[in-house]
Structure formats: structure tokens, C-alpha cells
Design a protein with these regions (language model features):
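Soluble extracytoplasmic regions of secretory-pathway and membrane proteins
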Residues: 1-381
Length: 381
């Protein structure tokens, strides 16, 4: 990797009280302590052997989608948008409304047919690869605001998306929104046309004998009209949901159309006693001022849904052993912190800071330091 390469890098660890970035030595010490906490609280991981522990930079693209909003697009395609949107009726059915229908039974049959069709799951599957979900994206906002231009000296993961890919994702997203607006328009037009048809039919129910038939027609029309309104409401909710997947440029303090941010995270590979490989991700976190005795590491998440979803999604993707898994593992092994003398010195200074700041009880500091040393010596042997 070119040591002179630079990029906009978001921190892995910040203080909760003021979002100040934690210095590198303290960051490494606390993130490894968090890893140890994560490892020891799962019985099946306690006897596992470390393979690597690395800091990695995950490529995140923020690209303008519309006048003010930005989509977050994952450069490694861990994430995607999978969704069902409401469709309109088969256009062949609409032609029947143009026919001249003069008898009551045929009118009721037609309206009943529309009701039956509308009761079907009129849905279309949508999948847009790479879009990051709102829980992750909103959770990253504080970090994105703290991102700064830095040398890319950590384990930079090469993005698998080109500028053309990013534009294609935005176009797909915009097309889905446009399609939903068009579907709303179609439902409105159908509703208006149907209402006019019913209005024309009403005048033909003029005598006393037709009152029961007119009542039946009105009831069927009211039922159908209500269902059409529900479809329109569904479409509007789907549009609102899709808008929730984007962030305002004002929220991000961004004005340029395409922004690339590197999100700092830590990843460990371990071998379980049954020889299965497992990956443990440490997403960006905060140094909390409120840690209980049962949770002895002073590191917590920005909010639980962000941390949990990001951690589980990436770990599951890596555990599935895709070609991307091997690419990331090879990259992390090449930057294995257990094997770097600079990292050993850095973490020693970090635990000295932890002790001075009284961030952890001394007994836990010694356990974690011992585990680092054992892993380092084992992998160097």
C-alpha cells in the first residue's frame, strides 16, 4: 500500500461526553479489551485461539440522491436494500370499465372482480445492492462528522464499487421512487374514473324497485373505493420508508455530490476448539462514563441497533466464506497487530493510560495484557 495515500477517515473510538477522538494508544488498548470482553462472555469462544487482530478501513460512499439527500453505499456490498413496493392492477382489467354495462348483475360482478384483484398481494420485489440501511447510516453520522483527512496507514479494504456503480445505485433508487409516484397517479385516476362511472350508473336506478340494487351498488363501490385509498396510502408509506434510507446533506455537513469516507473498525479471526473459524467485529464505539461492574470494559455503542446490526451483518457475511471473506482475511493477516512491534509498544502505552485514568480495574487490565502477550507470542512462534 502506498504510504502517501490519503483519505477521509472516521474514528473507531470517541469519548461519549464530547465526541473527542480517543488517541491511538488508548484506542488500541480499549478496543482489544472490548474484544476480550466479547470473547469471554460467549462460552463457545473462551478457549478459541487468535489468528489475527487488525484495524480495517471500510469504504463508505455518500452520494447525492436528489437535491438535498445522500445515500450511503457500501463499497464492499455487505448491505443492500430489499423491499416490496405496491403495484397497480393489470391494465387489461381496466379496459372493462370502458364497456357500456347496462344491467345491475354485470356491474356488481365487475366491481367484485376489482375487489378480488385488489385483495391479492399486489407487490413487486425490489433489490438494490450496496445501499446501507437507516439504522447503520444514522448511527454513523457522528463519526462521519468527525472524519478527517489522514494517511491510509491502517488496513484499507479496496472498494468493489466504481463511480459508475454508485450512479447506477442512485438511478435505481430514484427509479423506484418515480415508479411509486406513477403508481399513486394510476390508482388516483382509476378511483376518479370509477367514481364517474358509478355517478353515471346512479341515474339509472330511478324507481322504487331499484332501491335495493342501488344500495348494493353503493356498498360495493364504497368497499372498492376504500381499498383503492388503502393502496394509495401504502404507496405513500413506501415512499416515506425509502426517504428514510437517505440522509440530509445538512445533517452530514456535505455539499459535493460524491464523498468517500473510510470507517475505522477492528476485526479478529479466531479458531474454535472444533477447528471452525469465527470472526468478531468491533464496530465504531464510544468510551462511556457509565460502565457497570458486570461490563468491565468502558466501551459502549452509539446506540444498540446500530452496533448490533452492523456487527451481526458483517460477521455473518464473513462466516459464510464468500470470496470477499478470503480477500478481507488476507488483508487483515497482512496487517496483523499481534505481529507488529509498533502495536505492542502502542498497546503497552495504552494500558498505562487506562491505569492512570482508572478506566478499568487493575485485575482486568492484567488479564487483557496477558492475553495480548500470549496471542502475540503464539503467532510469532
Amino acid at each position: 500500500m502506498n504510504e502517501y495515500m490519503r483519505g477521509t477517515v472516521a474514528p473507531a473510538l470517541v469519548y461519549e461526553r464530547d465526541l473527542e477522538i480517543v488517541p491511538p494508544d488508548l484506542e488500541l488498548a480499549l478496543m482489544f479489551a472490548l474484544l476480550e470482553y466479547d470473547k469471554h462472555r460467549h462460552e463457545q469462544y473462551r478457549e478459541a485461539q487468535y489468528v489475527f487482530f487488525s484495524k480495517m478501513l471500510w469504504p463508505l460512499n455518500l452520494i447525492q440522491a436528489g437535491a438535498e439527500n445522500y445515500l450511503g453505499i457500501d463499497g464492499l456490498s455487505f448491505f443492500d436494500l430489499q423491499f416490496k413496493i405496491t403495484k397497480f392492477l393489470d391494465t387489461k382489467l381496466l379496459a372493462e370499465l370502458d364497456r357500456a354495462i347496462n344491467d345491475h348483475e354485470t356491474r356488481i360482478e365487475l366491481i367484485s372482480k376489482y375487489i378480488t384483484e385488489i385483495n391479492l398481494p399486489l407487490k413487486k420485489d425490489i433489490k438494490i445492492k450496496g445501499i446501507i440501511g437507516p439504522e447503520i447510516l444514522h448511527g454513523l453520522v457522528p463519526l462521519i462528522k468527525l472524519a478527517a483527512d489522514k494517511p491510509l496507514t491502517s488496513d484499507k479494504l479496496d472498494s468493489m464499487t466504481s463511480t459508475d456503480d454508485l450512479i447506477q445505485v442512485v438511478n435505481q433508487y430514484s427509479q423506484v421512487l418515480k415508479e411509486l409516484e406513477e403508481t399513486i397517479s394510476k390508482w388516483h385516476n382509476f378511483q376518479t374514473k370509477l367514481s364517474q362511472k358509478i355517478k353515471n350508473w346512479r341515474v339509472q336506478y330511478s324507481n322504487q324497485e331499484d332501491s335495493a340494487a342501488l344500495k348494493e351498488l353503493e356498498e360495493k363501490f364504497t368497499e372498492l373505493d376504500k381499498k383503492i385509498s388503502e393502496k394509495i396510502w401504502n404507496c405513500r408509506n413506501e415512499i416515506d420508508y425509502l426517504f428514510h434510507w437517505a440522509l440530509s446533506g445538512h445533517t452530514l455537513n456535505m455539499v459535493i455530490p460524491i464523498n468517500k469516507i473510510w470507517i475505522s473498525m477492528y476485526l479478529a479471526g479466531i479458531i474454535l476448539p472444533n477447528n471452525n473459524e469465527k470472526f468478531l467485529l468491533l464496530p465504531p464505539s464510544i468510551v462511556s462514563s457509565n460502565i457497570t461492574a458486570t461490563r468491565w470494559v468502558p466501551v459502549d455503542s452509539f446506540h444498540s441497533s446500530f452496533y448490533k446490526i452492523l456487527k451481526e451483518k458483517v460477521e455473518a457475511m464473513l462466516d459464510s466464506q464468500t470470496p470477499l471473506t478470503q480477500k478481507i482475511v488476507d488483508s487483515c493477516k497482512a496487517q496483523n497487530l499481534f505481529l507488529k512491534e509498533d502495536a505492542n509498544k502502542l498497546i503497552s502505552r495504552g494500558y498505562q493510560r487506562v491505569r492512570e485514568k482508572k478506566l478499568m480495574e487493575p485485575k482486568y487490565i492484567e488479564v487483557v495484557k496477558g492475553d495480548w502477550q500470549k496471542a502475540s507470542e503464539y503467532l510469532k512462534s
